[in-house]
Amino acid sequence: MPTINQLIANPRKIQKSRNKVPALEACPQKRGVCTRVYTTTPKKPNSALRKVAKVRLTNGFEVIGYIPGEGHNLQEHSVVMIRGGRVKDLPGVRYHILRGVLDTQGVKNRKQRRSKYGAKRPK
């Protein structure tokens, strides 16, 4: 605990919160081109092959985006839109790729939470 004189000499510094999605530059979404599409394994208690893509954004950032939903059509040079939102069990994945936007197709046969996966309303 500092003394009063110590606090007068150098007051307490306000801690700045760091940006969790710096590549978006305060935009809701950003467009980019896939440079690599691959699968990776999650952290310790979980086990799966998670689909991710390395994306070069229009502002020059290179980020890793998660591809949500079952099945996808992405490959190298696909143009995608990313949004913020990390994947807790994949270190370094701080962005999500939007389904049903630009080159990314929506999830097939999706009945619930369709808007999250770019799926059209079933007839």
From Swiss-Prot:
3-methylthioaspartic acid carried by residues = 89
- A Pfam match: Ribosom_S12_S23
Q: Which GO terms describe its biological process?
A: translation
Q: Name one GO cellular component term.
A: small ribosomal subunit
Q: Which InterPro entries match?
A: NA-bd_OB-fold, Ribosomal_uS12, Ribosomal_uS12_bac
UniProt entry keywords in alphabetical sequence: Methylation, Ribonucleoprotein, Ribosomal protein, RNA-binding, rRNA-binding, tRNA-binding
* GO molecular function ontology, one term from the record: structural constituent of ribosome
> Which HAMAP family does the record cross-reference, listed alphabetically?
Ribosomal_uS12_B (MF_00403_B)
Q: How does it assemble?
A: Part of the 30S ribosomal subunit. Contacts proteins S8 and S17. May interact with IF1 in the 30S initiation complex.
Tell me, in a sentence or two, what this protein's role is.
With S4 and S5 plays an important role in translational accuracy. Interacts with and stabilizes bases of the 16S rRNA that are involved in tRNA selection in the A site and with the mRNA backbone. Located at the interface of the 30S and 50S subunits, it traverses the body of the 30S subunit contacting proteins on the other side and probably holding the rRNA structure together. The combined cluster of proteins S8, S12 and S17 appears to hold together the shoulder and platform of the 30S subunit.
Q: Which family does it belong to?
A: Belongs to the universal ribosomal protein uS12 family.
| Official protein name in the record | Small ribosomal subunit protein uS12
Identify the coding gene. rpsL
